[in-house]
Regions:
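Helical mechanochemical/support elements of P-loop NTPase systems and associated helical scaffolds
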Residues: 4, 18, 28-34, 47-53, ...
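Short, ordered loop/turn segments at secondary-structure junctions
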Residues: 38-40, 238, 320, 333-334, ...
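Duplex nucleic acid-engaging cores and interfaces of nucleic-acid transaction enzymes
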Residues: 50-53, 60, 64-317, 323-427, ...
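OB-fold/S1-family RNA-binding modules
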Residues: 270-276, 402-489, 494, 544-638, ...
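Generic start-of-chain signal for non-secretory N-termini
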Residues: 1-20, 27
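Accessory alpha-helical DNA-binding modules that contact the DNA backbone or grooves
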Residues: 31-32, 43, 47-148, 485-630, ...
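S1/OB-fold single-stranded RNA-binding interface
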Residues: 99-103, 112-117, 127-129, 135, ...
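Structured core elements
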Residues: 34, 232-234, 314-317, 327-330, ...
Length: 719
């Protein structure tokens, strides 16, 4: 365990105390959101991202220690374990190193070497490989001829001995480690196209890039091309250098045996070592590609979920379509459905379009709609033109302001047909549910998007080339962190949302809703303890992330944990706040009252930690604050810009819709996202686009080039 802790300290640049505390907290069953938010004193303020990476690494290192113990036991059972082997295993830092050491002792299928050993040729191989043999090698090999064992002559015996030596060289852990490093550091990935046709993989038809430097997105693109049988892929390395290295290690200066050993070296490299290391390198590259894709997906998903909500506005959700019509849902400022309609605004006769416009205008006026949330799918461009016309007419006819925002409708159709949607809207047609989802995504992106499988949200890069289980686990962690960072209203939250709260699983989430339906709204956080299967530990983990607006205890509607209520009340008393101040939540002058306070001394006096005290003060100054409100709001539009209107040099405001390894895709309102290539993101060097932009960012861009035929827009964020 000490070894694990030491490695974690180095890798995460933390203290031994931090490492031990985090491990203990995790082993006690505490969740990452709970530890990040309410155990800052013990972790030294490590955030949720570091804690998740720490947890993942801890699991890997523990598995590593288990494998070490297994390999030591397995070699010991063969009575071949030496002190040196055990020491080498314990020093290993990766599973690959352990498997290299175990390789000679691992049960094998019947290889050429094993067949030769069965023929009694191992002593011949060992004698030759030792370099101590004197005399004629062919005469010596004659002594191993045995017709019964299918060793007909000296050449057969030497061929079998060569196979054994080849495998002995291949199984040597130190040799493999050096060769693997050589291939990794100086080798390359080379690809060739098997077709002359134009395909998405055209750039890889004659391609070469260093193993060490190839970026994740190219690895996955090459893998996809290979899987489609459009590309052939090889790992290339300097085999002559590898053979020279093995010559220096294996040749003994014996002219009689060295020629023979050299043939075994060449055979070992070409037949055993290189193909095996090529498979390992390809596997490592795929893992690198998957990690890169998952990291980008996580960052994009987090930014999307944490987009600033548009609160307190009546919204019209607009799901565009042609043949089946456009689906409309009007939502009040809490997301409740006020009205629904189907209009044929983008297809059909002029009379039909006029009727559709009239219906939409009536809905806007009747329900005092302020913003339209327009889905970006089929018929979105045509629908946008209709909306622009409606906005102009409403302004002229009754001086009414109306805006629209184009919203990604990715996953809306999946949600519409889901069991969850059926439970939420049993009496509303499946086709209308998509419009409700599109409208609610504008009102509260987080609450609405957690209902959808993250993979269906459409912000991934090569997500279909990543192991599903690995991707699911990573994305679930992102959603959990976002939901807990914002907090949830206990009395209106759906089971889908509650299930992401720290300490609550799907079953407990259903029990909470069942309790609420049977007993009415929760009156206090502590009432959670009456919910079936929600015990003291689950309550500790979840309470701080659940808000109860109806509670008489105002702290129940903050992110302050119940365990800190006493400290909070002592603080307010210390700062001379009255009961009237508490009732009216009048803490505007808090900064003035605490400006001369020594936080560490006050924390001791209140029997809490300084980080917790700072969090308490931050929350009291703005009870129930939503961290998303500090982020930029979506761009509200009133008119249409078309691709043909764009000219090089034109400056526009846009919203980042997706980020990849090679750049960012920005929505500038023309139904075709423009690409800001990584080289155009800044005047300074940019290592990765995520260092500069995130999904949802509002950015100023200038147009570099427009290709209407290929529907490509090149943008720049340089000054």
């Amino acid at each position: 365990m000490e070894n694990i802790n030491s490695r974690l300290i180095k890798e995460f640049a933390i203290t031994m105390e931090q490492a031990e505390s985090v491990i203990q907290l995790l082993d006690e069953g505490n969740t990452v959101p709970f530890i990040a938010r309410y155990r800052k004193e013990r972790t030294g303020g490590l955030d949720d991202i570091i804690l998740r990476n720490f947890t993942e690494r801890l699991i890997y290192l523990r598995n590593l220690e288990e494998r070490k113990a297994d390999v030591i036991r397995l070699i010991g059972e063969q009575e071949k374990l030496t002190e040196e082997i055990e020491k080498s295993i314990n020093k290993s830092e990766t599973l690959t190193e352990i498997e290299d050491i175990y390789r000679p002792y691992k049960p094998k299928k019947r290889t050429r070497a094993i067949i030769a050993i069965e023929k009694g040729l191992k002593p011949l191989a060992e004698t030759i490989f030792s370099g101590g043999f004197k005399g004629d090698i062919n005469d010596y090999a004659q002594g191993f001829v045995c017709e019964d064992k299918l060793v007909s002559n000296a050449l057969d015996a030497l061929a079998g001995a060569g196979d054994i030596i080849s495998e002995m060289i291949s199984d040597e852990a130190d040799y493999r480690k050096w060769i693997r490093g050589q291939v990794h550091n100086f080798g390359s990935v080379e690809t060739k196209g098997s077709s002359e046709d134009t395909t998405p993989f055209e750039m890889y038809y004659e391609y070469k890039e260093g193993i060490k430097t190839i970026p994740p997105h190219r690895i996955l693109a090459i893998n996809r091309g290979e899987k489609s049988k459009i590309l052939s892929v090889k790992i290339k390395a300097d085999n002559d250098k590898i053979i020279d290295y093995l010559r220096n290690k294996c040749l003994k200066g014996n002219s009689e045996t060295d020629k023979f050993i050299e043939l075994s070296i060449i055979d070992s490299v070409k037949r055993l070592i290189f193909p095996s290391i090529e498979r390992e390198i390809r596997s490592e590259l795929t893992e690198k590609g998957e990690i890169g894709a998952i990291d980008i997906f996580k960052a994009n998903l987090k930014a999307l979920l944490m987009q600033s909500p548009i609160k307190g506005k009546v919204v019209l959700g607009f799901d565009p379509g042609f043949r089946t019509g456009c689906k409309i849902a009007v939502l009040d400022d809490t997301g409740k459905v006020l009205d629904i309609a189907t209009v044929y605004a983008t297809a059909g006769s002029q009379d039909g379009v006029k009727k559709s416009i009239a219906i939409i205008k009536d809905l806007v006026i009747k329900h005092n709609v302020e913003v339209v949330s327009l889905g970006n799918g089929t018929a979105s461009r045509e629908s946008e033109e209709i909306l622009a016309q409606i906005i102009t007419e409403l302004k002229q006819e009754c001086s009414r302001d109306l805006y629209y925002v184009i919203v990604s409708e990715a996953g809306a159709s999946v949600y519409s047909a889901s069991e969850l949607a059926s439970k939420e809207y049993p009496d509303i047609d499946v086709s209308i549910r998509g419009a409700i989802s599109i409208g609610r995504r504008l009102q509260d992106p987080l609450v609405e998007l957690v209902k959808i499988d993250p993979k269906a949200i459409g912000v991934g890069q090569y997500q279909h080339d990543v192991a599903p289980k690995k991707l699911d686990e990573s994305l679930k962690g992102v959603v959990e962190d976002c939901v807990n960072a914002v907090g949830v209203d206990l009395n209106i939250a759906t089971p889908a949302l509650l299930a992401y709260i720290s300490g609550i699983n799907a079953a407990i989430a259903q029990n909470i809703v069942a309790y609420r339906e049977e007993n009415g709204k929760f009156k206090a956080r502590k009432e959670l303890l009456k919910v079936k299967r929600l015990g003291a530990k689950a309550y500790e983990q979840c309470a701080g992330f659940l808000r109860v607006m109806e509670s008489n205890e105002f702290l129940d509607n903050t992110s302050i944990h119940p365990e800190s209520y006493n400290a909070t009340k002592k603080l307010l008393d210390f700062l001379n706040y009255t009961k009237e101040d508490l009732k009216s939540l009048n803490f505007k002058d808090m900064d003035e009252r605490i400006k001369d306070i020594n936080f560490n001394e006050l924390a001791l006096k209140l029997e809490t930690g300084a980080p917790t005290l700072r969090d308490i003060i931050k929350e009291i100054k703005k009870p129930g604050r939503d961290p998303r409100e500090e982020l930029p709001k979506p761009i509200l539009k009133t008119g249409v810009v078309q691709m043909k209107d764009l000219k090089p040099g034109m400056k526009l405001m846009g919203t980042v819709r997706n980020v990849s390894d090679f750049g960012a895709f920005v929505d500038i309102g023309v139904h075709q996202d423009g690409l800001v290539h990584i080289s155009q993101l800044s005047d300074k060097f940019v290592k990765h686009p995520l260092d500069v932009v995130s999904v949802g960012d509002i950015v100023e861009v200038s147009v570099i080039e427009v290709d209407e035929k290929r529907k490509r827009i090149s943008l720049s964020m340089k000054n």
